[in-house]
């Protein structure tokens, strides 16, 4: 718990005691006291609506109640500088800013751990994201999902949740058969033999390369073997080739997974039919028209869903149910699935299946990744200049850089359509959000280097009481909000709140820097305090950028 949180608790307790004295309630009768940070600093550091909450109990107007509470609030509290009543009965608090300087040694000590909390209390979450078919390159939707999923996992972990990242490999569907047939055709082609290319095959350059690899590895060994034997071998090689590309691209994007879960393993380990039997035992399966159905309408789905078709083949829904049952049986409290925009209609049926299995539907959360449109110089970009095909994640990283790609994808809520401005992402100006934040970090690093060259090291023993200007206090207030912002971003599943915070922090630092001289050799004690202050800003900027998978450069 940091200084800001401790003072919030002290303030809430002080308000409670004031209510007891002014209104005549027992402590247990006082409703929950909520503190809000006013958007306009003119309205104080904190505000509470407790007087409005008490109106019915006290049988008085909220403002009249507030007027009775305020005198009690002003008694014996060094934390509060001023209290005022606003509007119909809001109580605004102006705190004595001197307490803020206690933050500096705390942040310096916690360093990379600054921002961590036990807010999540170790609750076990699994976040499954990206999960692209292993049949080609990652597109922009996958890239946005990767950035948001990884950032969310980082944020929730810092907020005290136990988080596992998982990639579901769709390696059991018809698309894999097409991949194998495509690889087979390119294998024959690489050996100079005629082969009919499958109608729905994959024609990318990567499959041509795979065919050459197979020819180099096996020669003509599989030319005359049975189709079954050849395709069984090529299936393993093709999947290894494609998943290897996915892993490499994601690792370059600074995204890693704790588990790569194969759909095929559900069949190999007999996980599918037991899931069906559990649904049957729970009374939600019926047979109709030769097919096997799940009665999802019992759980607010708009129609029942087929699990096994009349020809005996499974729909996609059945293995998906088995997979989610497997996740829950692994002990996760909550599952977060991050899906593409085209899966929005899939949510009600999957939540229904979770409930039909005997779990709470609230144990499944789904975050939808909306579409991404690229723009450059105001013109929409649909094709890669390099390949003449759809722009891939790899293309975008090469064009605007890894940091800009990660940061820009985290800037907007995942459920909003995104226009990605490539020109802005490449610009080296303060209009570029990621440049603006990284430049603040680099500028601080430069000042600290200059101080070190003059024999001035950052120390926790500096006299922090010398930090007294409004810009210093404003910067400290923003620094003190970091852990709360992380917890809020975790709770709301909203990485974009970290982006917003970093922009606010960079702005606060730049305002401080423009109005306060840091390196003043004629005033060494103030200089030492300000060096310590900007070091805390550097630490917090770095920690926030790290959550988003973005680097914190020392020089720019």
Swiss-Prot record:
GO cellular component: cytoplasm
Claim: Protein biosynthesis is one of the keywords in the record: yes
Residue span of motif 'HIGH' region: 132-142
Broad class of the protein's primary localization: cytoplasm
Catalytic activity: tRNA(Arg) + L-arginine + ATP = L-arginyl-tRNA(Arg) + AMP + diphosphate
Gene3D superfamilies in the cross-refs: Arginyl tRNA synthetase N-terminal domain, HUPs, Isoleucyl-tRNA Synthetase, Domain 1
Catalytic activity, EC: 6.1.1.19
Keywords: Aminoacyl-tRNA synthetase, ATP-binding, Cytoplasm, Ligase, Nucleotide-binding, Protein biosynthesis
Lineage: superkingdom: Bacteria
Record family assignment: Belongs to the class-I aminoacyl-tRNA synthetase family.
PANTHER family with a match to the protein in the record: ARGININE--TRNA LIGASE, CYTOPLASMIC, ARGINYL-TRNA SYNTHETASE
Protein name per the record: Arginine--tRNA ligase
Organism: Listeria monocytogenes serotype 4b (strain F2365)
Gene name linked to the record: argS
């Amino acid at each position: 718990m940091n200084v800001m949180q401790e003072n919030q608790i002290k303030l809430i307790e002080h308000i409670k005691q004031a209510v007891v004295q002014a209104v005549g309630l027992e402590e247990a009768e006082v409703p929950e006291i909520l503190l809000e940070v006013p958007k306009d600093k003119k309205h104080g550091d904190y505000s509470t609506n407790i007087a409005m909450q008490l109106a019915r109990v006290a049988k008085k107007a909220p403002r009249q109640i507030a007027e009775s509470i305020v005198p009690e609030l002003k008694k014996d509290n060094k934390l509060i500088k001023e209290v005022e009543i606003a509007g119909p009965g809001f109580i605004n608090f102006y705190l004595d800013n001197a307490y803020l300087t206690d933050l500096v040694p705390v942040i310096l000590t916690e360093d990379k751990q600054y921002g961590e909390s036990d807010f999540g209390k170790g609750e076990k979450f699994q976040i499954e994201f990206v999960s692209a078919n292993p049949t080609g390159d990652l597109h922009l939707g996958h890239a946005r999902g990767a950035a948001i999923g990884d950032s969310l996992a980082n944020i929730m972990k810092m907020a005290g949740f136990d988080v596992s990242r998982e990639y579901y490999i769709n390696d059991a569907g018809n698309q894999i058969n097409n991949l194998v047939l495509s690889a087979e055709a390119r294998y024959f082609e690489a050996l100079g033999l005629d082969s009919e290319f499958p109608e729905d095959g994959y024609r990318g350059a990567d499959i041509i390369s795979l065919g050459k690899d197979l020819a180099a590895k096996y020669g003509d060994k599989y030319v005359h073997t049975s189709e079954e034997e050849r395709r069984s071998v090529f299936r393993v090689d093709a999947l290894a080739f494609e998943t290897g590309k996915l892993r490499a691209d994601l690792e370059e994007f600074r995204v890693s997974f704790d588990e790569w879960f194969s759909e095929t393993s559900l069949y190999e380990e007999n996980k599918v039919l037991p899931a069906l039997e559990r649904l049957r035992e729970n009374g939600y399966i019926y047979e109709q028209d030769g097919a096997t159905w799940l009665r999802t309408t019992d759980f607010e789905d708009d129609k029942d869903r087929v699990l096994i078709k009349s020809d005996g083949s499974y729909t996609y829904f059945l293995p998906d149910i088995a997979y989610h049952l497997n996740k829950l049986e692994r002990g996760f409290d909550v599952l977060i699935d991050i899906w593409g925009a085209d899966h929005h209609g899939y949510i009600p049926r999957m939540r229904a299946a979770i409930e039909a299995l005997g779990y709470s539907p609230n144990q499944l959360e789904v975050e939808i990744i909306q579409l991404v449109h690229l723009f450059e110089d105001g013109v929409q970009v649909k094709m890669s200049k390099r390949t003449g095909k759809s722009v891939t994640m790899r293309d975008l990283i090469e064009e605007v850089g890894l940091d800009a790609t990660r940061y820009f994808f985290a800037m907007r809520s995942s459920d909003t359509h995104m226009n990605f401005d490539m020109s802005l992402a490449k610009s080296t100006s303060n209009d570029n959000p990621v440049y603006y934040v990284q430049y603040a970090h680099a500028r601080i690093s430069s000042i600290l280097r200059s101080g070190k060259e003059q024999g001035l090291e950052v120390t926790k023993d500096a006299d922090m009481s010398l930090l007294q200007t409004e810009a210093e206090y404003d910067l400290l207030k923003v620094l003190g909000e970091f852990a709360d912002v992380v917890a809020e971003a975790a709770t709301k599943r909203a990485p974009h709140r970290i982006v917003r915070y970093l922009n606010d922090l960079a702005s606060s630092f730049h305002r401080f820097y423009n109005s306060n001289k840091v390196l003043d050799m004629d005033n060494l004690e103030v200089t030492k305090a300000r060096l310590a202050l900007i070091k805390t800003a550097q630490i917090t900027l770095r920690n926030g950028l790290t959550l988003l998978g973005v680097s914190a450069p020392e020089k720019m």
